């Protein structure tokens, strides 16, 4: 049987760091308020002129190097983002050209904070069916460009960054299962209420901002992530104790802790970066995964659960043996 196995990970964060103290100077908030409700202490914000693909390129190069391959060995690019450089072509195509790759399929996926899990699941299917041998999967965002920096309920939450993995076809066990879901009835609880075909004038005026009803999102997220943990374990006939690491979407420390409790997992088996990165949307899971791989926490052969919840609502999980 052919599995899709992670051969290498990579990530990149902009140099510019914005702390909670910095935000105290911009909006009516406080470091204590932000920490107590979200766990966030700082976030990285892209510099003017720094784009989503700029961040993704560095993460991709790091992942390719870690995998021990050449960029031209890549035969599929799946790019998860909500903040593309252009309406078209896709970020995947722009990145493909920068990496000197020609001819392979390259496309974007938009599932907001669940985007990386969606992209990983898609690439895994290509590999399982023999349509790809080495896939580059990316989650990258410049979410700071769609934030209203006068809205204290949203501007304190998000950051910019990029993460990537190289998936390769292997006889060794890799991704064990993926689980994807969505429910569009919750559209307006977390959205940007304008776009290309709807209120484009607001976009042109630079007024395309994230709007969120945080309390409602929190309630649905906690319940939904609890259910997908059960679904993932049941699909693999696994016990909670068999999972070595949880790498969750980094939205809010309270949501992360609730998922860990669902797994009866101590927090030292949970990869947490939200305190330093904020919510980087589709980039958060690959950023956290790369950090834990590079610092030696996640080892080959260990079982890792990835899970995410985002606008749409969308949610998903991936269980893998690293």
From Swiss-Prot:
GO cellular component, one term: cytoplasm
GO terms under biological process: fatty acid biosynthetic process
Pathway(s) the chain acts in: Lipid metabolism; fatty acid biosynthesis
Top enzyme class: transferase
Reactions listed under catalytic activity: malonyl-[ACP] + acetyl-CoA + H(+) = 3-oxobutanoyl-[ACP] + CO2 + CoA
Active site residues per record: 113, 249, 279
Record region (ACP-binding): 250-254
InterPro entries for this protein: ACP_syn_III_C, ACP_syn_III_N, FabH, Thiolase-like
Domain of life: Bacteria
Chief place of localization: cytoplasm
Gene3D superfamilies linked: 3.40.47.10
Enzyme Commission code(s) on record: 2.3.1.180
Location of this chain's protein in the cell: Cytoplasm
Job of this protein: Catalyzes the condensation reaction of fatty acid synthesis by the addition to an acyl acceptor of two carbons from malonyl-ACP. Catalyzes the first condensation reaction which initiates fatty acid synthesis and may therefore play a role in governing the total rate of fatty acid production. Possesses both acetoacetyl-ACP synthase and acetyl transacylase activities. Its substrate specificity determines the biosynthesis of branched-chain and/or straight-chain of fatty acids.
Subunit structure: Homodimer.
HAMAP family: FabH (MF_01815)
PANTHER family assigned: 3-OXOACYL-[ACYL-CARRIER-PROTEIN] SYNTHASE (PTHR43091), BETA-KETOACYL-[ACYL-CARRIER-PROTEIN] SYNTHASE III, CHLOROPLASTIC (PTHR43091:SF1)
Family of this protein: Belongs to the thiolase-like superfamily. FabH family.
Domain notes: The last Arg residue of the ACP-binding site is essential for the weak association between ACP/AcpP and FabH.
Official protein name in the record: Beta-ketoacyl-[acyl-carrier-protein] synthase III
